[in-house]
Amino acid sequence: MSEARLHSPDPRTPRPMAGWAASLRDSGLLALAVPRVFAGMERDWGEIFAGVRHLAEQELELARRLALHHLQIASILLLGSPEQQRRLLPASVERRWLWSEAVDLRRAQPEAQEHWRGGFLVGGRGSDCFAVEDVDRLLISAWHAPSRAHLIAVAETGRAGIDISGLADGSGLFLPAGQRLHYQRLRLHPEDILVPPGLPPPPCGQLREGLTRLAQANLDLGQAARVPGDVAGQGEAPRLLALALRLVELAAESFQAAFARGGALTFRESAAASLLASEAEAVARAGLLACLRRQALEARLLGAAL
């Protein structure tokens, strides 16, 4: 990743997020997680997340976008059929698609109704998303009431039935600020569906959430590295950050091994990798908060001395 060049957009431009997207498309980083058989670069997860971490030291919003993109590529590898992978991944590399997501498996909205020939119609308020107006493809979720389960699907952002409007307040992973999606009779074709509703989740499904937590841990470590060294090197922060760095490295190795297992992956192996990612996220967040508290204390002391 050190060979790539990323240039921050001018914050005075009317659409700075468009500048972020253009920077990523020009960087050569979008194909890192795509296997070589699909014309990608096939880097391991340790290298990918190290790049996200270092990028977060410079431009946190850009790092968030890059992490989200790679998580969607991973989702296609984990959840998609061989035909879906052959259709989506080479096109993503060739056309430099930027991916994001509107997946929320905790809410029973939006709603999906079965449509003809195995498709679905989706309507209602979707998830709050991070800067989706300049991405090319989305992973979305919808609630299917008859099966009392969610589906996960792929859709292009310009598809009829997707309305991107307003600013979301931002909460949870990757949502410092974003857009709110609404769906109006959004048609999903059978080939769009990565996870049909009502089927038991496979072991690889756990890895998706674990990867999200591992990405957040690396973003937190990158943000902590932006705190001046004389501040971050005091108190409990150094111990926490060193432990978090080791945990994210171990978790990345665990996920790499899990991906290599393919269809032979067990629930036990998937759960172990995801648990390690959760521990890394918790320690990284604690280290970041320790840095920020120390920085705030130093600022107050400096202000009192002036």
Regions found by a protein language model. Name each.
Residues 2, 7-15:
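Long, charge-rich alpha-helical interaction segments
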Residues 17-130:
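Glycine-rich flavin
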Residues 59, 218, 225-228, 244, ...:
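A structural signal for well-ordered alpha-helices, especially hydrophobic packing surfaces
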Residues 125-126, 165-170:
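Glycine-rich, charged/polar anion/phosphate-binding loops
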Residues 128-164:
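A short core secondary-structure module
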Residues 168-234:
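Glycine-rich beta->alpha junctions and the first turn(s) of the following alpha-helix
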Residues 235-272:
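C-terminal hydrophobic structural anchor segments
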Residues 265-306:
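Glycine-rich phosphate/cofactor-binding loops in nucleotide/flavin-utilizing enzymes
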